Design a protein with these regions (language model features):
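Flexible "arm" and connector segments at domain edges
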Residues: 2-78, 84-210, 214-268
Length: 268
């Protein structure tokens, strides 16, 4: 006899789910199906792609943080949360009759086979760099992107702005549209900063000019081999550290918040 315990939806009905020492992929599919069933969880069964979109992003970022921390236990947990999100979205589509989780897996396996002809075919690539070039060429052919502009249009607009800027710049550079070295990128950044200053003084076009400054800064980072998001993340951590030093100093010296700027400069 199966050992079953129950999930309760509203205290009115019980949904049986087999308890066992270890679960697998099929169990995840089944528990998501049960949670979204008419007898399942009141919250889960009313969710849509849009309502849990943020959850997917947050779980991906939490997995990324686990990688940064090199915490295997945390990474295992967070990858599970990401996988749960993927299965949840696929189950919504299964109910709509548009695709299933099997279709998702089938599609990604076929994509990997197609984009690795040097492994599963007769093509030859002898370096990671040549593999990336081949991957991009195959991706563009697969998606029917005949021009660099079409490839740029396909870069996800939901990406963090700095990463999107970096990807767009790389595609332009691959097409031959770029500064020859970092000096040109630095000069452009200085030019954009001057234009931002003028915009602030006139009160017109500040948002556009600020965007230009950030875009130019990303290009400098690209020439220097620096990930712009990681650079900003590091600055955020530095800001927290310095702010706490200022805050602690102000408290110890009985100073007011108005005096924190002077302490801040001392902390730098």
């Amino acid at each position: 006899m199966k050992n079953t315990n129950s999930y309760c939806n509203k205290g009115e009905t019980m949904v049986n789910f087999t308890r066992k020492p270890r679960y697998g992929y099929e169990d995840l599919l089944e528990i998501i199906r049960l949670l979204r069933s008419p007898e399942g969880c009141p919250w889960d069964k009313v969710q849509t792609h849009a309502s849990i979109r943020r959850g997917l992003l947050e779980e991906a970022y939490e997995a990324a943080e686990a990688i940064d921390l090199d915490n295997a236990g945390l990474l295992q947990e967070e990858l599970g949360d990401v996988m749960m999100q993927v299965v949840f979205h696929a189950d919504i589509e299964k109910d709509r009759g548009r695709f299933t989780m099997d279709d998702v897996v089938d599609g990604v396996v076929k994509k990997l086979l197609y984009r690795h002809p040097h492994v599963f075919g007769s093509a030859h690539e002898d370096s990671p760099e040549s593999v990336l070039i081949s991957w991009d060429q195959l991706k563009r052919a697969e998606k029917g992107q005949a021009t660099t502009g079409e490839a740029m249009e396909a870069v996800a607009r939901s990406l963090p702005g700095l990463w999107r800027a970096e990807k767009l710049q790389k595609k332009a550079a691959d097409a031959g549209f770029d500064w020859p070295d970092i000096s040109g990128a630095l000069s452009k950044l200085e030019e954009e900063v001057r234009e931002l200053r003028q915009a602030v003084e006139t009160g017109r076009g500040v948002e556009e000019e600020l965007g230009d400054v950030l875009f130019a800064a990303v290009k400098v980072g690209r020439f220097a081999g620096i990930d712009p998001e990681e650079a900003v993340a590091g600055t955020c951590e530095k800001f927290i550290h310095r702010f706490r030093a200022v805050e602690d100093g102000a408290r110890e010296q009985g100073r007011t918040l108005e005096e924190m700027t002077r302490l801040w400069n001392r902390a730098k």
